[in-house]
């Protein structure tokens, strides 16, 4: 969140600025129409919104947990946009009452931070997704997703300028991917995993359903992309629940290494090392796409998702990335960056002029 302040703002010290910023956040939260406190949680600020979402503060940051919905529908997008609208309406009231110029919210996945030695580092939060699935499919759910999520980066990434090493910047598919270090893990703030093992069921533990907690994906602005990735993940869970088995010969040898390499090399021609052979990124996507096409019956949204997934893969194959502007975050950002770099005759490694 950025705040365009009144005169005198720049004369404040860091502690005063932090306190002032927090007062703005608290003011925004107080102006949001809350339904009820979110029982069972012990955070300082934790409420349900009218659309069923939950809003709370964590480490002095406003976070919104979207309302429960059926994955594979448009409900997730509707709830997410509703939460954004509620937040923006409250912010506009604060802008007017405090005579600020503006308050801007950014849906991002990384930010500046410090390590234990006080060095500047990039920190990440990403987007957490929880899915309920039939417990009997637990093993295959993990097997499918741990292999498919690396291949989903060009579908799910929000785009990022990443400092590969000092002074060397590259464009990546994802803001989140380079911060993933393992397949399974409990911690969300460091040594992050593709699948988080904080998976206690959100329902009756004896109901036959388990919770899948994914912390590996980016939050995205393009509604189409958010819907697409959510629905594809839903289809992968359906495959596991309905008995599809990913053959061992088609599993990745090094999923985490593949995520990092694919992301930083920003290459749609990337090939994965499988147990039995090498397979291109696009063909590996087709392996899962063809399996999902065999699911019966398919809803209207599921059919639409499969059609769009295939259309995007064909655009990847033809290198027609600009055709995805407005549909995929990373493609949209890359289009804008390329245009600006051409206009100013600069590169990603050009020094930023001080204003």
Q: Regions from the language model: what does each represent?
A:
Residues 138-140:
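A short alpha->loop->secondary-structure connector
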Residues 1-108, 113, 123, 143-163, ...:
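Terminal catalytic/cofactor-binding subdomain
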Residues 180-182:
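Acidic pyrophosphate-coordinating catalytic loop
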Residues 109-110, 116-134:
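Histidine-centered divalent-metal-coordination microenvironment in nucleic-acid enzymes
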Residues 61, 128-130, 170, 211:
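A generic structural signal for beta-strand entry/edge sites
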Residues 165-167:
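Long amphipathic N-terminal alpha/beta scaffold segment
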Residues 173-174:
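Extended amphipathic ligand-handling, pore-lining, and cofactor/metal-binding catalytic surfaces
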